[in-house]
Curated annotation (Swiss-Prot):
Compartments it resides in: Mitochondrion
Keyword Metal-binding recorded: yes
GO cellular component: cytoplasm; mitochondrial matrix; mitochondrion
CXXCXGXG motif repeats: 230-237, 247-254, 269-276, 285-292
Additional remark text: Present with 7570 molecules/cell in log phase SD medium.
Name of the protein in question: DnaJ homolog 1, mitochondrial
InterPro entries named among the record's database cross-references: DnaJ, DnaJ_C, DnaJ_domain, DnaJ_domain_CS, HSP40/DnaJ_pept-bd, HSP_DnaJ_Cys-rich_dom, HSP_DnaJ_Cys-rich_dom_sf, J_dom_sf
Range annotated as the organelle transit peptide: 1-55
Keyword Repeat on entry: yes
Species this protein is from: Saccharomyces cerevisiae (strain ATCC 204508 / S288c)
Domain J: 59-127
Zinc fingers typed CR-type, residue spans: 217-297
Gene designation per UniProt: MDJ1
Length: 511
């Protein structure tokens, strides 16, 4: 708000000083200043830019500068510019006016090589570029948002001369809003030497095994369909020895004239899209029908896929996709750069029944162990992704879901460094399958003072004490419930184990 008030204050002072009693004109300009000052902060700053076309002197006809007719084609414009620019380049031509002529050539080529600017010039003449050689940008006039609006006031005069004392309102408002005045200096940017067209990317879904996702894979052959240049016309879209002809609608001007409501209006020719030339149907290539490209459904490419891939990853193969869907005349190929799009390989990783990947570089494996191994400790065998088997020790008292790490056995990070392999223990508790197993579990519960465990066997009160009939009956009924019967070998082995266990506990060294 302070910014707007300052602008209005400065503008009002200048108006009062120079306008004097021309109160009517002063009011009109003041209202314009209020309107533009109110909208100026909302205008995107990027729209205020300095044009590449600069000429502080009188605006020169770009066609005359390049020695061309208005019907000149793009190739003729480019050829004429290169020829004259080489002749008058300041590094080659040491004549005093060579640099000025070189800049005139740049300005002319800047207009005629751009379809939009050329159309504006053909339609409006020098007025399309501010009348003084400065091309109108998005904000109009050399970086000032008020350039085009106040430019016409510079020529306002009365019987006693200009009531504004020669004030240029474009310069005034341009300075107030940080822009340069009309015709302000600035380095010219070099013109684009060619146009670029890039083909569409192609996405391929490729499945890989878990092992290949971890370690990568070489010489993978991918099949896909893509656009290629027509093999008959080499991408021109035309038969050999044929060329575009002048447009029958606009007669080579690229524009059409319409009269509406007494006003003459010009628009881009709908037949040639402003090019001024067109292809005759009989000149179209018989293979691609004038498109310049053809579909190749049997393309293949051999690639190496990197290690450490995960499901959903995309591998980009640059410059191997489709050719641009555009036909380019043979004489314009030097001014057009065509490049293929990319191939995007979307990875789908087959699930492995044993392994999974977490944290990008760690391979996880779940290992089931019985409760006895978890309690007493032991040794287990673990498979690896490579197909090998390794043996690791289980610590006594291992808990459910406890994880151990095996260093440098995970997903490769570099050629020498890998992540870890994580082994997670799953303790399996099985239901007793025989009377012997049940007796041992109950004995363990009794020894460990487990009051919560269900017990059907009651220990004797002393060695040699007879077991009452009721207990024996219950034991027999429990035994009959088990489908698996204890054979003599099992019972003998159990007897020996218990006997040896008692001897070890009591310290008896007898065999």
């Amino acid at each position: 708000m302070a910014f707007q008030q300052g602008v209005l204050s400065r503008c009002s002072g200048v108006f009062r000083h120079h306008v004097g009693h021309s109160r009517h004109i002063n009011n009109i300009l003041y209202r314009h200043a209020i309107a533009f000052a109110s909208i100026a902060p909302r205008i995107p700053k990027s729209s205020f830019h300095t044009s590449a076309i600069r000429n502080n002197e009188a605006f020169k006809d770009p066609y005359d500068t390049l020695g061309l007719k208005k019907s000149a084609t793009g190739a003729e414009i480019k050829k004429a510019y290169y020829k004259l620019a080489k002749k008058y380049h300041p590094d080659i031509n040491k004549e005093p006016d060579a640099e000025k002529k070189f800049h005139d050539l740049q300005n002319a080529y800047e207009i005629l090589s751009d379809e939009t600017k050329r159309q504006q010039y053909d339609q409006f003449g020098p007025a399309a570029f501010g009348g003084g050689g400065a091309a109108g940008g998005a904000g109009g006039g050399s970086g000032s948002p008020f350039g085009s609006q106040f430019h016409d006031f510079s020529g306002f005069t009365s019987a006693g001369g200009s009531p504004f004392g020669g004030i240029n309102f474009e310069d005034l408002f341009g300075a107030a809003f940080g822009g340069g005045g009309r015709g302000s200096g600035g380095a010219s940017r070099s013109s684009s030497m060619f146009r670029q067209y890039r083909g569409d990317p192609i996405e391929i879904v490729h499945k890989v095994s878990f092992k290949d996702a971890v370690f990568g894979s070489k010489n993978v052959q991918l099949r896909f369909s893509a656009l290629d240049p027509c093999s008959t016309c080499s991408g021109t879209g035309m038969k050999p020895n044929t060329h575009k002809v002048s447009c029958s609608t606009c007669h080579g001007t690229g524009t059409t004239v319409h009269i509406r409501g007494g006003f003459q209006m010009m628009s881009t020719c709908p037949t040639c899209n402003g090019e001024g030339t067109m292809k005759r149907p009989q000149d179209n290539c018989t293979k691609c029908h004038g498109e310049g490209v053809q579909v190749n459904r049997a393309k293949t490419i051999t690639v190496d896929l990197p290690h450490g891939l995960q499901d959903g990853d995309v591998v980009r193969i640059p410059g191997q996709g489709s050719y641009p869907d555009i036909a380019v005349e043979a004489d314009l190929k030097d001014s057009v750069k065509l490049s293929r799009g990319d191939i995007l390989v979307r990875i789908r990783v087959d699930k492995d029944p044993n392994f999974s990947i977490k944290n990008k570089y760690d391979i996880w494996y779940d290992k089931e162990i019985p409760i006895t191994t978890a309690a007493l400790g032991g040794t287990v065998t673990i498979p690896t992704v490579e197909g090998q088997k390794i043996r690791i020790k289980v610590a006594p008292g291992t808990q459910y879901n406890q994880v151990i790490s095996i260093p440098n056995m995970g997903v490769p990070k570099t050629s020498t460094i890998r992540g870890d392999m994580k082994v997670q223990y799953k303790i399996v508790v099985k239901k007793p399958q025989s009377l012997a197993e049940k007796c041992l579990w109950e004995a363990l519960a009794d020894v460990t003072n487990d009051d919560m465990a269900k017990k059907t066997m009651q220990p004797g009160t002393a060695a040699g004490t007879a077991i009452n009939e009721e207990i024996l009956k219950k034991q027999k009924q429990e035994e009959e419930k088990h489908a698996k019967k204890d054979d003599d070998n099992t019972l003998k082995r159990l007897e020996n184990f218990i006997t040896n266990t008692f001897r070890k506990i009591k310290g008896d060294k007898k065999n």
